[in-house]
C-alpha cells in the first residue's frame, strides 16, 4: 500500500478496483483504511484529466453503484461510506452519478436496515443536497425530485424513535440549504421537535439542543416576504407558552404584577392536573422553552429580524420578583414547599437567558442591569445552597464586569463576594478536616496491615476518591472567575475584604484541586498581582511558589502546565523588567557628522531680510518654522594661520554672549504678547470645537474597537437585529441599533461585543515668538513646546443618558471628548 501511495493516485485506485473490490468478504474490513486514504490523500480528485484517469473514475463510480445494490448489508454499508468520501472531493462524480445514488440511498431508508446504515445514508444524501446550493441546474435534476421523499422517510424514521440526532441534523441542514421545499412539512417537523423536547421519555442533552435549534429554524420555511414577521411571531408564541407555564407554577403566589395571556394558537399541550402531580412536568417545560429561546437568539439569520426586547425583559423580571419572601395564598404546607423547591430552578433558567441576551445585545441589558443586580443579591442570599443559582449568577456578573469594564459600587456586590468567600472557606475547612482524618486512619491502619505496598495503594485510592467528592469543581471555577473579575475591575476594595480573597485562594491551593480549578486559580493569582490595591501582605512569593510547583509547571496535565508557563512569563516580566538596549557609542567624528546633519548653522549677518513665520489662526496646531536664509551662512576663505582661527573663535564667543543677553531681555518685554497670541489661538480652537461638537451631536455616535463595533442610531419605532452567527461562542462584528421609540421591539445585528480601553492621542504644539533687537534684527525663540497625552474617551467624560416617559424607553449615547488646556509657560 505504501508503494502505491508513492506512485500516485491512479495506480492506487486501480489496485482497489482490481483487488480489494473483487474480494467482497474482506471489503468491509478494508473500508476504514480506504476511506481514511481517500479523505487525506484526495485520490479521486487527483486522478487527473487524461483519458486513462477518466476511465478509472468512471469504473470507480460504476463499481460503487453496483455495490449499493448488493444483497449483503455489509457491502451496502461499505458502498455508502465510499460514496460519501467520493462526493466530498469530486464535483464531477456528483454531477454524473449523484441522481442515481440519491434514488438508491433514499430507497434504502424504507428498508429494515441497521441504525448505522440508516444514519450514514441520511448523512450522505444531506451532503449531496447541500453541495448543490447556488447551482440551479443541478438542483433541479438532483434535489427537486428527491427532497420530498427524503423528508418523508426521515420523519417516518423519527416517529419510530430511531436515529433522532441524525434526523434533526439532516433536516436542519436541508432547511438551511433549500428552505422553500420544506414548507409542506413545517407542522410535522414541529410535532417531532415537541415530542423530543416535551415528551415523557428522558433524552440526552445533545438531542434536546438539536431539536431546539431545528424548532427555531422553522421560520425559514415561510416565504421571503414574511421572513421577519414569522420570526417575531415564533418567538412571541414561545414567550406566551412560557407565561402560561409560569401561571400554573405561580398560581398560589400573590404576584405584584399580573401578566394576562390568551390561551389560543398554542403549540404545546395544556398543563392539567393537580399541582403535586404536574409541577415537575411544568418545570421541565420551562427548561424546554428556555432552551428554545436561547436557540432563537443563537441561530443565524440571513436578514434583519425584530426582537421583542421588552417582552423578554418582562419575562425575566417576573421570575426575579417571585422570591421566598412574597406572600402566598392559604394552601397546604406541602404545596408551599414544592413551590419553594421550584424557585431556584427557575432563577437558574432566567440567569442563563439573561446571559445570552447580554451576549447578543449588550446595551439592552446594561441599561437595566442595576435592577438585575438587586434581584441577583436577593436570589443568592436566599438560595445560596443551590448550585445552579450560584454558578449562573456568578457567570452573569463576571461577564458583565469583563465586557463593560465598569467600576460597580461596592454595595452592589459586597454581599455576593462575602458569600463566595464563605463558600471557599467552608470548602477549605472540609478539605483540611478530611485530610486530618485520612492521616489518622492511615497511621492506625498501617499498624494492623502486614505489607506496606497494600496500605499505600489503599490509602491512595481512598484519598483520591474522597478529594473529588468534597467540593464541586464547576462551582469553584465560577467562584475563582468571579473573584478575578472583581479584582480586575474594582478600583478600591476594603483591606479586610482584599485580604480574605488572597487567604482563601492560598487555602484552596493546599488541597488537591482539579485541572479546571487550577487554571482558574492561576488567573485569580495573576489578577491579584496585576491589581495590587490595599492589602496587608504581598501575594507574589506565594503565587510563584504555587505556579512553579506541582500545582503549576510540574503538573501532569499539559493544559495546566502550559497555562502556568504563560503565567510565570507574566510574573517574570513584572519582577524583572527588561529595559531597551543602550545605543551604540559614536566616535567623535561620527557624532559631529550626526550633529551637523540635524542642525543647520544660524546666520549672524544680514538677517534683516528674514520674514517672521505667519501663524495661521484657522489651522489646528500647526508647527511654526524658522525660514533659513537664502545665502550661505558663512562665506569664508581658506584660513591657514592659527592666530586668525583663535581670533574668529573669540569673536563668535562674544557674539553668542550678546545674543543670549539680548534674548533674555526681550523675552521679558514680549511675554504679554505671547500670552495674548496663545489666548487668541485657544479661543479660535474652542469655537471650532464647539461647532464640531454641535455637528457631531446630531449624528449617530460610533464606538469602534478593531473589528467589533457598535453603531448606535436613531430610528422611528423599532430597533433592528441580525444574528449573523449560528454558534454561541463565536464573536463577530456587531451592529446594535437602539431606538427612541414607544415600541417594545429591538432590531439587532449581533452576537458579542467587547468594550476595551480607548486609544490615546498625542497632542503637540509649538509656538514661536519673533523678538527684535535694538538694531532691527529679529531673533526667533521658542515660547512653548510640549506634548500631552490624553485619553480620547475618559471615564469622567463618557456618559450614557437614559430617559424614559412611562413605558417608553429612550436611550442615547453621549460621548464627549476631554478638553485640552494649553497654557503658556513663562519659563520657556
Curated annotation (Swiss-Prot):
One Gene Ontology cellular component annotation held by this UniProt entry: heterochromatin
Domain of life: Eukaryota
Sequence ranges of Acidic residues compositional bias: 805-814
Predominant localisation class: nucleus
The keyword Transcription is assigned to this record: yes
Pfam families: RIX1
Keyword field: Nucleus, rRNA processing, Transcription, Transcription regulation
Keyword Chaperone: no
Compartments it resides in: Nucleus
GO biological process: rRNA processing
Region span, Disordered: 604-707, 794-828
Biased composition (Polar residues): 604-618, 652-667, 694-705, 816-828
InterPro entries tied to this protein: ARM-type_fold, RIX1_N
Coiled-coil residue spans: none
Function, in words: Component of the RIX1 complex required for processing of ITS2 sequences from 35S pre-rRNA and the nucleoplasmic transit of the pre-60S ribosomal subunits. Regulates pre-60S association of the critical remodeling factor mdn1. Also required for heterochromatic gene silencing.
Complexes and interactors: Component of the RIX1 complex, composed of ipi1, rix1/ipi2 and crb3/ipi3 in a 1:2:2 stoichiometry. The complex interacts (via rix1) with mdn1 (via its hexameric AAA ATPase ring) and the pre-60S ribosome particles. Interacts with crb3/ipi3, gcr3 and Las1.
Similarity remark: Belongs to the RIX1/PELP1 family.
Record protein name field: Pre-rRNA-processing protein rix1
Organism: Schizosaccharomyces pombe (strain 972 / ATCC 24843) (Fission yeast)
